[in-house]
């Protein structure tokens, strides 16, 4: 079974790792797509990302649970990736429950992962306020 996850994965933290481990446990192949630098800046502001897309992709591909990882520049590219791989399950954070999910029409099932309270934005604020 193919499992799909997408996200920014800017400063990798325990919450990311726990979600990716959970996702891998659902199937045979874990496929991940990460937002490009341009997209992260558009979504999160001019000071982001902290880590560039090549480094973020390297970090994600280095994880034992991840079988492949792509970078996408737009919602249209993300839909194309999802449509092409046709994942059996897409894993999203629980904050996406009740909201439209990009590419969901190309997945057999959506699973929601309950966040542990970790976040890159919280980490950045904590560091900045020291």
Walk through the language-model features, giving the residues of each.
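Nucleotidyltransferase catalytic core that binds NTPs
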Residues: 1-130
């Amino acid at each position: 079974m193919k499992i799909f996850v997408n996200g920014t994965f800017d400063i990798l933290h325990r919450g990311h790792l726990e979600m990716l481990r959970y996702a891998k446990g659902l199937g045979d192949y874990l496929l991940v797509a990460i937002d490009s630098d341009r997209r992260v800046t558009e979504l999160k502001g001019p000071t982001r990302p902290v880590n560039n897309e090549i480094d973020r992709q390297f970090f994600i591909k280095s994880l034992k649970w991840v079988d492949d990882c792509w970078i996408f520049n737009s919602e249209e590219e993300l839909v194309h990736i999802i449509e092409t791989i046709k994942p059996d399950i897409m894993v999203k954070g629980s904050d996406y429950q009740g909201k439209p999910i990009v590419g969901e029409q190309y997945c057999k099932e959506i699973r929601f992962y309950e966040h542990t309270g970790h976040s890159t934005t919280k980490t950045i604020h904590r560091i900045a306020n020291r």
